[in-house]
Amino acid sequence: NKRNGVVAGRFESPVSLEGLAGPATERIWLGRSLGERVEWSFMEAGIEFRDEGPLPEDRGRFLIRSDVAVTRDAVTAFADAVGTTDARWEVGGRLGNFVADLSFGDDGPWLVYLAPGGPVTPERIAQAEPLTMDSKERLLEFPLSEDHHGASMVELPISDRLLMPTSHWLQLLWANLLGLGPFLWRNLMGSNILQVALRGAWAA
């Protein structure tokens, strides 16, 4: 369903791209360009996305940094949570810690909401207040060779609510790895992670 009174767009990243050709929006995420995937995420969440021109000041504005990957579920959760003041996305849990480790000191902002009224400015984007989101994560265990890695397994936090920068090639790689499972489950089974887990538990 379309959300009234809001619109989405991009703001440019101050972080230099590393390791792969740019621009960031043309790099590949989950089989298509990052720019296309991000636009779909907003549109699937019911939010009009405008790639060019200033956004209308009489609407609430969601602004995502040009190098950031975001899923529909992350957009939906953030849109449901924002109020009447400017806000910036933050996420807790293991996923938040994992993405923070991969950010190489880049703490954003990556996604902000600016309330209606007043222009979009870099200062306003930077001053948006943090809004901590529930990551709704699941931990998946992957076996390792204890002789080589010093541990028998590693736990990765997987969530439908993924949002992370991709300016560095390693970040883009992880964005594809972390996003692949939820992407495949949603597209092949028409379900989110929780529904898949419940379906599996019921079958057992």
What are these regions (language model features)?
Residues 1-203:
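Terminal amphipathic alpha-helical/low-complexity segments used for targeting or macromolecular assembly
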